[in-house]
């Protein structure tokens, strides 16, 4: 398969040639004629076959351009920069012009040693930009963080949003600082010893971009239905150029922005019946570009094929999020059994996910009313990312409230001392009290109204509050309330420092037989080499047997005592002994 035979395999978008020209290439089988409008002139793109059209014209990095489809002006589907947002022109970018200083960087910590920190650029600082985040990197590195995980930065509607309604999947969000700002942040992160993982959304596009994309070609398929809109066309007629558009996006983040890993959003909504699944192909492309680059999946499948090697028939992701760990822990701590939480809440389930990362590994799910999942017996603990808070589990609550302060110490204890790869959500390390609410800045009135109404409708069935009280996503105050205040609890901050310090002393891996619990108490006990984790999930004190332990290494609460082979724990408290 050569580029001459399949023209979509060549670089899409605007590629500066270094000789005062730029090659513009786009997949556009739908229109009769396509021009590129740049420097005040139109230039017709010549057909290359399979709907690919191209032209090399006099232009340079920094020039704005638009494609003109039978007279209709539209941005480039492969745009690298939308300086005026979704409706403005694209801008030619030469990513090679950035003066990188990370020549000695080799990818950062291995997964088994990783501690990930999820952040939203727009609310992480008052300024809400890539550049403003740089000042906080040394502090995160000193805490023990090894990788930042940026929520999506592909160009989305307006000036603020979560990023999951992005349209231009290769363009760094203009309101955050555009491509140059992202390169600055990554370069500074590497200087601070931090890797950077980028959250990317390849299961759908934001509704604001559907009409534009459909003008070019069949980027979407009607074969499948997804919650957020139209499914991307990975296996229907004319899907090859669409696949390549996504693959070039993934590769471009790693190559041109020195991104150390991709977090793939909701892969259970990526539908592909091709002989070679798009996720296998994406892993091939990314790992060929950088063999140390990470691909981490958010999967609602509980299927070990996600991380199984491609050589063994899997999709080859390096790791996946382990939602069941969060659900088992949160419900046990809070008693919140709404929605899909309804089947969680027993300490035996938390013990199970300490042994293996899925609560449902082929057994019956009462929420789904069917058997669900498969045993991950051939997978390793460093292939699963765990958390007690993240953007979804906080922000998809009606008011975006974080874990209650009274249970956060025990939640952090379980998460950070687990055998898995821990991830923190921005601000939890010092007990941030600002909520993280669902906010948008849609530029299309119909979409804005539908989003706000949908949010109210989603929570109308809950008797604990009125749907009218649910924050309006389009109200700027909803966004502003979600910015970090950086005010918290010094005791929580000290606990996180100690937990992350102690984590480095724990042996790698785990023994599934070294986990037990008392459902009646309820308490959990996990042995990790010479160490034993003991957690009391009751609202009253408990005494947990820890035979042979002679040292209290760490306790989440005062009033914890170790004596005579037992550790006495206050309510909702944890201790590490050896």
Residues covered by each model-derived region:
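Conserved, mostly hydrophobic/aromatic
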Residues: 26, 67, 119, 140, ...
């Amino acid at each position: 398969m050569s580029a001459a035979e399949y023209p979509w395999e060549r670089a899409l978008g605007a590629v500066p040639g270094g000789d005062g020209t730029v090659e513009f290439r786009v997949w556009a089988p739908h229109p009769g004629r396509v021009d590129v409008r740049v420097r005040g002139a139109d230039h017709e793109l010549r057909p290359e076959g399979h709907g690919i059209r191209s032209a090399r014209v006099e232009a340079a990095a920094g020039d704005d351009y638009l494609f003109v489809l039978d007279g209709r002006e539209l941005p480039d589907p492969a745009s690298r920069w939308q300086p005026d947002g979704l409706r403005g022109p694209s801008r030619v970018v030469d990513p090679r012009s950035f003066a990188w200083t990370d020549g000695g960087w080799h990818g950062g910590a291995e997964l088994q040693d990783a501690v990930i920190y999820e952040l939203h650029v727009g609310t992480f600082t008052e300024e809400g930009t890539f550049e403003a985040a740089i000042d906080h990197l040394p502090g995160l590195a000193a805490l023990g963080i090894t990788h930042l995980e940026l929520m999506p930065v592909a160009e989305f509607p307006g000036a603020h949003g979560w990023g999951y309604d992005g349209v231009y999947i290769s363009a760094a969000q203009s309101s955050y600082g555009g491509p140059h700002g992202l390169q600055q942040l990554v370069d500074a992160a590497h200087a601070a010893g931090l890797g950077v993982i980028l959250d990317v959304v390849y299961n759908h596009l934001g509704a604001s971009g559907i009409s534009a994309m459909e003008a070019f070609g069949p980027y979407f398929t009607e074969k499948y239905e997804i919650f957020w809109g139209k499914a991307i066309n990975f296996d229907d007629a004319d899907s090859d150029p669409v696949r390549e558009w996504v693959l070039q996006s993934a590769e471009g983040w790693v190559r041109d922005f020195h991104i150390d890993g991709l977090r793939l959003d909701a892969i259970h909504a990526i539908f592909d019946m091709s002989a070679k699944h798009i996720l296998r192909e994406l892993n091939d492309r990314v790992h060929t570009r950088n063999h140390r680059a990470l691909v981490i999946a958010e999967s609602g499948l509980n299927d070990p094929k996600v991380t199984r090697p491609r050589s063994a028939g899997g999709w080859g992701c390096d790791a996946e999020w382990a939602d069941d760990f969060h659900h088992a822990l949160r419900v046990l701590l809070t008693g919140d059994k709404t929605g899909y939480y309804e089947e969680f809440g027993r300490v035996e389930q938390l013990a199970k996910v300490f042994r293996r990362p899925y609560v449902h590994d082929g057994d019956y799910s009462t929420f789904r009313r069917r058997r669900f999942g498969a045993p991950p017996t051939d997978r390793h603990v460093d292939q699963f990312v765990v958390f007690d808070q993240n953007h979804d589990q906080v922000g998809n609550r009606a008011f975006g409230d974080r874990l209650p302060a009274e249970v956060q110490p025990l939640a952090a204890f379980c998460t950070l001392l687990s055998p898995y790869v821990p991830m923190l959500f921005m601000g939890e390390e010092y007990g941030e009290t600002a909520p993280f609410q669902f906010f948008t800045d849609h530029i299309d009135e119909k979409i804005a109204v539908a989003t706000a109404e949908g949010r109210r409708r989603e929570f109308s069935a809950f008797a604990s509050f009125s749907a009218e009280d649910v924050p309006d996503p389009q109200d700027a105050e909803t966004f502003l309330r979600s910015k970090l205040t950086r005010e918290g609890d010094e005791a929580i901050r000290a606990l996180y420092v100690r937990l992350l310090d102690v984590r480095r002393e724990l042996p790698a891996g785990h023994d599934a037989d070294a986990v037990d619990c008392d459902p009646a108490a309820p308490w959990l006990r996990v042995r990790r080499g010479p160490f034993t984790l003991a957690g009391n999930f009751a609202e009253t004190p408990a005494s947990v047997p820890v035979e042979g332990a002679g040292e209290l290494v760490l306790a989440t609460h005062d009033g914890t005592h170790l004596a005579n082979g037992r550790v006495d724990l206050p309510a909702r408290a944890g201790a590490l002994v050896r």
